Amino acid sequence: MKGLIIIGSAQVGSHTNALSKYLKGQLGEHDVEVEIFDLAEKPIHQLDFAGTTQAVDEIKNNVKSLQNKAMEADFLILGTPNYHGSFSGILKNALDHLNMDHFKMKPVGLICNSGGIVSSEPLSHLRVIVRSLLGIAVPTQIATHDSDYAKLEDGTLYLEDNEFQLRSKLFVDQIVSFVTNSPYEHLK
């Protein structure tokens, strides 16, 4: 079983990244191979059908890599910071390079982090997009706050809150169950 976590934060070492790494560890306990595609480290340009933007080779390679990894994945997790009550623009740019073939009947987990007011609004917006791309957003979603994390001596963030650790377990169990049981495999 393979999964892809797409992190839509512009900040390297973000809270969304820390949550993604935590989930990758939990999925690993189920013998799931998970790759993290962090858009802060692998930028993608906005979609340009007119061809007026000259994308550098690195960005073109990032787009192709994202598309290939999404196609190979049995499930996806979309992670974003809360930007003005919605998901990030860089995640939107990345999603614009994907289509229904990348999502069709695949379970999709939704996660976000807020620095200010805790809000699940970005996840509600992503849920509509996942449905439009024929993906299946799992029922449990995770919306954390900066205060749910602590820092190691080297500054690395980690999920400290026990409640969210339990919620993460339910989230992971749902994704694994959807993939394992494949209730919609015949519709692909």
Swiss-Prot record:
Subunit structure: Homotetramer.
Organism of provenance: Staphylococcus epidermidis (strain ATCC 12228 / FDA PCI 1200)
Keywords: Flavoprotein, FMN, NADP, Oxidoreductase
Cofactors demanded by this protein: FMN
Enzyme's top EC category: oxidoreductase
Annotated EC: 1.7.-.-
Gene3D superfamilies in the record: 3.40.50.360
InterPro entries xrefs: Flavoprotein-like_sf, FMN_Rdtase-like_dom, NAD(P)H-dep_reductase
Pfam families attached to this UniProt entry: FMN_red (PF03358)
Gene Ontology CC: cytosol
GO function terms (MF aspect): FMN binding; oxidoreductase activity
UniProt name for this protein: FMN-dependent NADPH-azoreductase
Protein family according to the UniProt entry: Belongs to the azoreductase type 2 family.
SUPFAM superfamilies: Flavoproteins
Disulfide bonds: none
